Amino acid sequence: CLTVDCYPGVDDEIFDLIKEIYKPDFVIKSEDVFYEKDELNKMMTPFLTEGRVRGVMYYGKMDDLIDDIKLAQYQSLASHKGRVLVYGVGASYIHKGDTLIYCDLACWEIQLRYRKGMPNFKQDNDDEDILKKIKRSFFIEWRIADKHKMDIFENIDYFLDSNQEGNPKIVTGNALRSALK
């Protein structure tokens, strides 16, 4: 099983590239284990104040936003025979993977993509005020994504930088961890 865990905002270009190279027999997209948009919005309401910019910092974790029933269903699917690809935000919750790739994206690049119309995670807010998109990311999405990245950091086999569209870069997890010492 190849698991590609992603920071929110990584686009389908990376998914398509990995599918082309890995040629999986079975694909699981991790986005499906998260609560649906309306439920997520209800959970996030206390942290997203009325103003365009100010909010309340969310101190929870990514798994707070994951539906345990869906997660269990997808975890059983990950034992499918053949080449399985588990891809997306929080993918390592579904399966740790025989190989774990973490696909990263800088917050600045995410802001640039928001300006081009990218929605927030599990939302359809393409045309929403850019400051509200950034507020949702700053107070909630980036917090949980950063915690999750640190939780799995020591287990990452390859670290993929997806900041430059059309030009992803990859380094081994060991090389990155050594460079950061």
Regions found by a protein language model. Give the residues of each.
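Structural motif
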Residues: V4-G9, Y87-G90, N163
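Catalytic cores of nucleic-acid editing and processing enzymes
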Residues: I18-I28, Q73-L77, V89-A91, D129-K132, ...
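ATP-dependent small-molecule kinase phosphotransfer cores
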Residues: P24-R83
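Extended, regular secondary-structure scaffolds
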Residues: A106, L112-K116, Q123-A145
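Hydrophobic/aromatic beta-strand patches that form the interior of the parallel beta-sheet core
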Residues: L2, F26-I28, L85, T99-Y102, ...
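ATP-dependent NMP and nucleoside kinases share a basic, alpha-helical "lid"
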Residues: I21-Y22, L71-D124
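N-terminal active-site beta-alpha-beta segment that forms phosphate/nucleotide-binding
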Residues: C1-D38
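NTP-dependent small-molecule kinase module
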Residues: C1, I14-K23, K116-P119, F138-K181
